[in-house]
Amino acid sequence: MRAARHAWAIQRDLTHFIVINFPVRDGDELAPQRDFRKIRTKARSWLYHRRSHRIVDPLTDVRTWESASGVEHVNWLIHIPHGLTGEFLAMLPVWIGKVFGSLPEGAYHVEEIYNLNGVLKYILKGTQQGHAHRFGINPVYQGEVWGRRAVASTCLGKTARERDEFDGQVVRTSRFRKQKTPA
């Protein structure tokens, strides 16, 4: 939650919610994470080259992994700069198809984010019971996942948050947590 709020605070709010379903591969539990890393690398490279004439912001995203229904999938919240949304969403199935070998039906789903706090509570429902109450989340078992269940990009990590606060880029007040995200 802190990472997503920090994205909003540094004016790189998470704009799209993408769910990618990974094919089942017997005996290779880490394949979905490797495949997602390839998709994310393609997206990062594409954004870098599209924005080469301007200051380049790093890829800003948050992702959680779930496997409740037996199909491992990633919930990916990503910042897509205005003006590049159409091109990005057109390239997404191409990247997924290249990594998967073909694009199966139902491999991905994309939605715009209108209520960030609601989406965060949804994707973080796999949080451990001991921690969920702090965030107002009703925990639900989301299956076994190999690797980290929740990951934020390095530009939203703890060190980046501390650096941005130290540099005066972000000023946190007691009202910061209660601020509504812009529509």
Report the location of each language-model feature.
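Right-hand nucleic-acid polymerase module
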Residues: 1-72, 80-183
